[in-house]
Amino acid sequence: MRFLILFLALSLGGIDAAPPLQSRVVGGFNCEKNSQPWQVAVYDNKEHICGGVLLERNWVLTAAHCYVDQYEVWLGKNKLFQEEPSAQHRLVSKSFPHPGFNMSLLTLKEIPPGADFSNDLMLLRLSKPADITDAVKPITLPTKESKLGSTCLASGWGSITPTKWQKPDDLQCVFLKLLPIKNCIENHNVKVTDVMLCAGEMSGGKNICKGDSGGPLICDSVLQGITSTGPIPCGKPGVPAMYTNLIKFNSWIKDTMTKNS
């Protein structure tokens, strides 16, 4: 199946059909070196397509809409376009998209209003375990939900401009607020469900963007979400982004890793 980057072009005035979804960081800053050691860069045929999170030495979590036929990943990177001694390259032996994600959406040229992107997560089993270092460390799954209003951190190598495709070299971080789900329900034309999180800045100027899909949303130092969808232009005022709510999927994630290790 061909890869389709997911990101919504949304407006409060509404549209007949949104183009394919995409995600990236705008309004952020260069992450401190090795401050996000769980961050993964996911590639398709040498092209960076998504972010991911290292959960265990053999397992990376990303978004289901990042699905392609073959993957490779880089761990321990701070700079996307430079060779680094800390970086580790791994192939992916098998991918496990969540069975509840509607994979047929990835074949569409346009995303229809009301499309349901629930269950947007996927596990990647690495062909060789990651070596744990200062630059490469797994992060644990959440045990409880963060409170609304919590400060969250999203990260990735997605575009740093709202409408043009401009990848940064340095890993980008951006602080966002965890918002009531109604903020996303009122401002997105796709279906918003209770397995999603809503985060952003209602004033605009900061958000995830193209290339950040599958990356982490960390709230109060706890991994709570995986980047799923957001607006174009990125950082549009009044339109937060949506993330897969990981606490809803703890059992599936753990069971899948256990049964396929």
From Swiss-Prot:
PROSITE patterns xref list: TRYPSIN_DOM (PS50240), TRYPSIN_HIS (PS00134), TRYPSIN_SER (PS00135)
Catalytic residues in the record: 65 (charge relay system), 120 (charge relay system), 213 (charge relay system)
Signal peptide start and end residues: 1-18
Gene3D superfamilies named in the record: Trypsin-like serine proteases (2.40.10.10)
Residues listed as glycosylation sites in the UniProt record: 102
The UniProt record lists the keyword NADP: no
Domain Peptidase S1: 25-258
Pfam families referenced in this protein's UniProt entry, alphabetically: Trypsin (PF00089)
Catalysis: reaction(s): Preferential cleavage of Arg-|-Xaa bonds in small molecule substrates. Highly selective action to release kallidin (lysyl-bradykinin) from kininogen involves hydrolysis of Met-|-Xaa or Leu-|-Xaa
Name the record gives this protein: Kallikrein 1-related peptidase b8
